[in-house]
UniProtKB/Swiss-Prot annotation, chains A, B:
Residues the record lists as binding D-glyceraldehyde 3-phosphate: 138-140, 169, 192-193
One term of GO molecular function: NAD binding
GO BP field: glycolytic process
Name of the protein described by the UniProt record: Glyceraldehyde-3-phosphate dehydrogenase
Organism the protein comes from: Thermoplasma acidophilum (strain ATCC 25905 / DSM 1728 / JCM 9062 / NBRC 15155 / AMRC-C165)
Amino acid sequence: MIRVGINGYGTIGRRVARAVSLQDDMIVTGIVKTKPDYVSMVASRDFKIFVPDKSYEKAFQDAGIKVEGTVENLIDDSEIIVDATPEGQGEKNKDLYVKRRIKAIFEGGEEPEIAQASFNAYSNFEEARSKDYVRVVSCNTTALARTLHPLRERFGIRYVDATIVRRATDPNDSKKGPINAVEPSLSIPSHHAPDLRTVMSGLNVSTIAIKAPTTLMHVHAVRVELEKDASKNDVIEAWRSYRRIMEIGKNSGITSTGQMMDLAREFGRDRSDLYEIAVWSQSVSVQGNHVSYIQAVHQESDVVPENVDAIRSMFDIADRDRSVSMTDSKLKIEKRVF
Amino acid sequence: MIRVGINGYGTIGRRVARAVSLQDDMIVTGIVKTKPDYVSMVASRDFKIFVPDKSYEKAFQDAGIKVEGTVENLIDDSEIIVDATPEGQGEKNKDLYVKRRIKAIFEGGEEPEIAQASFNAYSNFEEARSKDYVRVVSCNTTALARTLHPLRERFGIRYVDATIVRRATDPNDSKKGPINAVEPSLSIPSHHAPDLRTVMSGLNVSTIAIKAPTTLMHVHAVRVELEKDASKNDVIEAWRSYRRIMEIGKNSGITSTGQMMDLAREFGRDRSDLYEIAVWSQSVSVQGNHVSYIQAVHQESDVVPENVDAIRSMFDIADRDRSVSMTDSKLKIEKRVF
């Protein structure tokens, strides 16, 4: 049983904690929280709570939440830390992990240089093998790697051009905008293109990112120039053996991210999450070697299974297909075609 | 075991089906769907699917979904129908229920005259006892009845004035608006005031309804003139023995409906629902016999436990407190203070 500590229990940390706790080969040693808010109040039923340092303890005590110790205590009781602290904080935390000689996973908000390898289970599981510091790429990069990897493997890829319509913020955030404007990121390529190359080495890719006033999902319009001609059927077939890609057909009646997340609620999973990248099969269009498709990405959860697989790769306890199968089985990810 | 058929499997029908299936004293005999969409695709794993009439069968067969029969077949196999069809359709369906001599529950979109009694578990459980046709009032009316009933019981109520900031539509709907305007309902009182009197007989109440561009929850600003003076503590204390009222304190850090629904996701319930009416305890303000407070209402789910209790009242198999306890226990509704 790999002993996993979770430093940071926000959108990603909470979900990784739950996903790890569902696996047969790993357990959660505890979580680090900074505030005794509603998330801590619920979490304290399931997980041991640690704090960054002793100065945080009193607030938790006042709120009636038991604190087990500091992050150092959590590290001492763990074999790996998943650092899901806010963007940029992981870099500050790394010194501690190095000093205490503990493995660590960082999330996509950190720079690639923080880790020995960036990670996506489908496209480069092997590169994290036995590494001490690994970074799981962001939700958007994960999504692109998921659907592009099978195409690259089957047909080869000459060029990718993706337009990423980003959700403005997460559903629990009422501070950030925009609420009534569309906000393009004016430097092209957006940071997603180089980030994608950290898990799909040498990929020729450009990306444009545009923020839209929604909190539910990202939507990607992807254009791919393959190395050889394919048919629409070939493309869909290439995705068929990958459970983390979900086909959404015309009969499903799903035409928006609103319905897509409603579908996720029907699955009965933790937090009504949608781990799969949902590709509208109706949108898949092929002309010779040019493929276009549209996919929806649940930004809160698509990286969750990736974190679990990264742990297995770093401890060298399973190969890609076995790890992905174990993770998917516990998270109720099955191949679904709608 | 009471045999419950669900006619209409939209926002409310799906949730009532799940809630009924979790009880020890009732089972779901089947659900009626009109389209073989994503909801049907998932539902067919758990429930028998029926259709309004034979003309609907082919579409389901083409989508590979087994149809068990028509709504008449479902009625023949059931002891009660929960009619959660779209607003106004329940009235059309009632003839069939009368003809087939089956009990039926209607939802708040129907007119009160459709039923022998309107229903809220806290305020008038007894009025549905042994009745054949009962209407569970709408989400907003349910919410008002929940928090007003304990105040009326403890202090008496002279007058209520509530402003209802309504969510524009449900999260899975991308057709309706408004998306960027606030839309007051200009007739005062809004329909909620007379509706509330159907479950709180003789209550002196006025309501104003204003639509806001959000899909998450309704928010109510409630002002109550009690028959006698009270303190803030008295008011909160009056709610304390009611599990379906949840206290949200300042330490929780919850200041918006975004965080409120995020809290619900932490509970791990079906569809991440929030059955309780969430009252911000910080907002409770009392001056003599004048009380003000703000509450948030999850429009998709607050009526779900009410439907379960209405069934028990109609079959006269439990009194209010016993039914509510049974329902709450299976839906993981416990008294929570944040």
